[in-house]
Amino acid sequence: GARVVAFDYSANMIALAQKRQSRYLDHIRFCVADATDEEQLMALRGEKPFDKAVSNMAVMDITDAAPLFRCVSCLLADGGIFVFATQHPCFVTLTDRYLTPHSYYDIAIEGQPQKQCYYHRSLQDIFALCFDNGFVIDGFLEESFGGKEKPDVIIVRAKKIARG
């Protein structure tokens, strides 16, 4: 069977995930870890390299995503797959500063009590995180919701290439 390591910066989110997945606790190791802290990320290492890694709608919430991509590359086996989804930088962050990384505040879920901070990165910056860490992009999807023609989300499949 698969061995799964799930992490989040928030202990509250980890507690909710453990409760939600209580019947799988013997198959999932839940950890509190900061995606910008290489030491914490590398502590997630198991006996063998991981075959796959997934980040669902988190990259835009991370101040500096470089440590995450660097560590995912280190933790994956050669040929391993990293799939991540994030806000579409062309259509969600409507800004005249598209090429310049910056933060901004917005609502994620209708009715939330206050705006949250997001970190805008251009497509070339997002792809550079992959390329600079030994990944090739072998899949790319732009997802829209509610019949809209403009996509809200990008889903990237990156494959770790063998370095030798």
Kindly label every feature range from the protein language model:
Residues 1-41:
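Class I SAM-dependent methyltransferase SAM/SAH-binding core
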Residues 18, 69-73, 127, 131:
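A structural alpha-helix within SAM-dependent methyltransferase catalytic domains
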Residues 41-53:
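A short acidic, Gly/Pro-enriched loop at the edge of an enzyme's catalytic core
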Residues 66-81:
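A short glycine-rich, Lys/Arg-flanked "PGG" loop and its adjoining helix->strand segment in the class I
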Residues 133-135, 143, 148-164:
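Core SAM-dependent methyltransferase catalytic element
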Residues 81-110:
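Conserved class I S-adenosyl-L-methionine
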Residues 51-66:
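A short SAM/SAH-binding and catalytic strip from SAM-dependent methyltransferases
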Residues 116-140:
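Short alpha-helix
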